[in-house]
Amino acid sequence: MKQFLAAAQEIDPSYHLISGYRSVAYQTELYNSYVQQEMADDPTLTESQAEKKVQTYSQPPGASEHQTGLAIDMSTVDSLDEADPATVAKVKKIAPKYGFVLRFPDGKTSSTGVGYEDWHFRYVGKESAEYMTEHNLTLEEYLVLLKEKTK
């Protein structure tokens, strides 16, 4: 991860780690704060509706990849989803060399269930990352392919 971040900083020195491993307690706190913010922004939302909306950009405790230690959020800015698209494209291109993939790519929400996140990278190993990138596969699509090959 340190090598990947260093390589990203060679592309843009302002690239920095925003989040890595998260405990269940921290993910609970973060998730609940997002739900409360959605309800404050739209008082007509029920808690269930707010949770459904939140789950398009943050996972509930126990479901977040950050709890595995395999996911990182990194960007050039502190406000997520505001990085320069050209810079993100360059970082996405080098990610497989370090075993990472952009976890929730643009146009793949139907596969991942999560909207585009230009900051969220997942470690899958170099070989898998290179294959997934070459074939434009999400982790979900890649896992289906692996299961089919083992049949």
What label would you give each PLM region?
Residues 1-150:
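Cell-envelope/glycan interface and biosynthesis
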